[in-house]
Amino acid sequence: MNNSEDPFQQVVKDTKEQLNRINNYITRHNTAGDDDQEEEIQDILKDVEETIVDLDRSIIVMKRDENEDVSGREAQVKNIKQQLDALKLRFDRRIQESTQTTIPLEETVENSTLNTSMAENNDGGMSNPFQEQMLREQDVHLDGIHKTMQNLHIQAQTMGDELENQGQLLDNMDEGMDGVVNKLARGRRQLEWVYEKNKEKYDDCCIGLLIVVLIVLLVLAFIA
């Protein structure tokens, strides 16, 4: 199966893209933004954590197949976990640095209003549309991850059903072999019974044939 067709690889790819987006956002914004943006980032990080749990579960299912090599998949999930831990550390540090900065309330409101006005004048009002576009793209990626995880769940269920069917097939084969062995044993006992029943009669026939042969030989000897 190609990576483009593998649901596992698709989830890994989407998850890495989400982490890269958050990393780029944190890199561009050294300080914490408004509450909505920070909450959105926290939600994405939680979604990534849940995705990692689902990936670990899918690896456990794949390990049941002895022919499946999951070492590469385990390395990919480990790399994602490391990226997530690093981003969470950077995110928490930004929050702490933001809360430690004490600015009078009036000055904060005044500066915020001034900065907002300047940003609107310099950027031509593109800040909010850019944020909305980023959020829409994140929603699309999350929907893709959700659908891919559903496919992984369906595949895991299918593999479980196949293993269960194979177990039932082996049980049926064992029962069939037991039936064949029992039939062979009954046939052997019947043959032994027939042999014992007719053994004396067969012995008498053999003795009679030997007597006839001896008489014929004696007659031929006298004639000669």
Curated annotation (Swiss-Prot):
Function: SNARE protein (of Qc type) involved in membrane fusion probably in retrograde traffic of cytosolic double-membrane vesicles derived from both, early and possibly late endosomes/PVC (prevacuolar compartment) back to the trans-Golgi network (TGN or late Golgi). It has been reported to function both as a (target membrane) t-SNARE and as a (vesicle) v-SNARE. Upon vesicle tethering to the target membrane, which requires additional proteins, a SNARE-pin is formed.
GO terms for cellular component: cytosol; early endosome membrane; endomembrane system; endosome; endosome membrane; Golgi membrane; late endosome membrane; SNARE complex
Swiss-Prot/TrEMBL keywords: Coiled coil, Endosome, Golgi apparatus, Isopeptide bond, Lipoprotein, Membrane, Palmitate, Phosphoprotein, Protein transport, Transmembrane, Transmembrane helix, Transport, Ubl conjugation
Transmembrane segment boundaries: 204-224
Principal place of residence: Golgi
Lipid group attachment sites (S-palmitoyl cysteine): 205-206
Subcellular localization, as worded in the UniProt entry: Golgi apparatus, trans-Golgi network membrane; Early endosome membrane; Late endosome membrane
Residues in the Cytoplasmic compartment per record: 1-203
InterPro entries (UniProt xref): SNARE (IPR010989), Syntaxin (IPR045242), Syntaxin/epimorphin_CS (IPR006012), T_SNARE_dom (IPR000727), Tlg1p-like_N (IPR048036)
Taxonomic source organism: Saccharomyces cerevisiae (strain ATCC 204508 / S288c)
Protein name: t-SNARE affecting a late Golgi compartment protein 1
Post-translational modifications reported in the UniProt record: Phosphorylated at Thr-31 by TPK1 and dephosphorylated by SIT4.
Keyword Cytoplasm: no
Keyword Protein biosynthesis in record: no
Any one GO MF annotation of this record: SNAP receptor activity
Family in the record: Belongs to the syntaxin family.
